[in-house]
Amino acid sequence: MGGLSLLQLPRDKFRKSSFFVWVIILFQKAFSMPLGVVTNSTLEVTEIDQLVCKDHLASTDQLKSVGLNLEGSGVSTDIPSATKRWGFRSGVPPKVVSYEAGEWAENCYNLEIKKPDGSECLPPPPDGVRGFPRCRYVHKAQGTGPCPGDYAFHKDGAFFLYDRLASTVIYRGVNFAEGVIAFLILAKPKETFLQSPPIREAVNYTENTSSYYATSYLEYEIENFGAQHSTTLFKIDNNTFVRLDRPHTPQFLFQLNDTIHLHQQLSNTTGRLIWTLDANINADIGEWAFWENKKISPNNYVEKSCLSKLYRSTRQKTMMRHRRELQREESPTGPPGSIRTWFQRIPLGWFHCTYQKGKQHCRLRIRQKVEE
């Protein structure tokens, strides 16, 4: 009893203390005070709400939708590797979303695939859908395949980026790049951040000589497209091909093309001549990380926003170029059911969307900061 008496409070003080305890509990429930601190480099959504995005969204002009290419994450961009990331499904309607700005792609793709009966595998592009405007290399592939489904989707849940439109499906005969859509939150909206396109613009942006960004085309033939095992042939001319059986770079294919022409190894008959690659040949020549030395727009889109920490890459030495590793096996991912790292960087969890009068309204979810 003596021990208990030390813990007891006078009745009036007990009422005051319990009152303040309940006030603190209700206050925490109402304002969602963070009960922990960030002790490592891993940020949770609730922690980012408090520590990263503290600015209030004053206008929708502060939100900028940007297309981010997957090749910036180091995925293999050769045709045999890329086609393994795409697959056919039925019963899922395609979805299209617009975006305001994007990167210049090093690798784009253009597919025209037919079924064995001669019908088309891929749907034509809807009105208003044009090809991705900035491509260094366009991989044009023709061929046949079972195409077991209505549409070709991305197996990792990414988008196919077209000209300021991103779709979940591949359209026939249109240049596209693989990517995702992110939303940048600018502290203050600036008119110069995203310049509006001219009223009249060329259908093919790459024809604009002022861009200093020439586009090169590589042609392929694919057999059994959409199946687990497919064959990819690099086209030298109408009768000369090279079988591609491992990851490679666009620069390697151009060098291979020049070598075959130089040594006059073309087919001299009406039949097909198919070459195979020597196992000792290095197929990743010239593959410097394009995002470190490619030509960019004169106006660098650099803004300090509350999402800057999310898109900050690992620290690297300046004035250095690094080779991208192209191996048969991709880097290990998380446990089954996890999301790819490049997909986790999309801050979709910070926007709260509601439907009012048949229209969708989205706003940034900002937790109020408790004044000390």
UniProtKB/Swiss-Prot annotation:
Keywords assigned: Cleavage on pair of basic residues, Disulfide bond, Glycoprotein, Ion channel, Ion transport, Secreted, Signal, Transport, Viral ion channel
Disulfide bonds: 108-135, 121-147
Alphabetical list of InterPro entries matching this protein: GPC_FiloV (IPR014625), GPC_filovir-type_extra_dom (IPR002561)
Feature type site, description Cleavage: 324-325
A single GO molecular function term of this UniProt record: channel activity
A Pfam family that the UniProt record links to this protein: Filo_glycop
GO biological process annotation, one example: monoatomic ion transmembrane transport
Region of interest called Disordered, as start-end residue ranges on this chain: 320-340
Signal peptide span: 1-32
Positions annotated as glycosylated: 40, 204, 208, 238, 257, 268
Any one cellular-component term (Gene Ontology): extracellular region
Entry similarity comment: Belongs to the filoviruses glycoprotein family.
Protein name: Pre-small/secreted glycoprotein
UniProt organism field: Sudan ebolavirus (strain Human/Uganda/Gulu/2000)
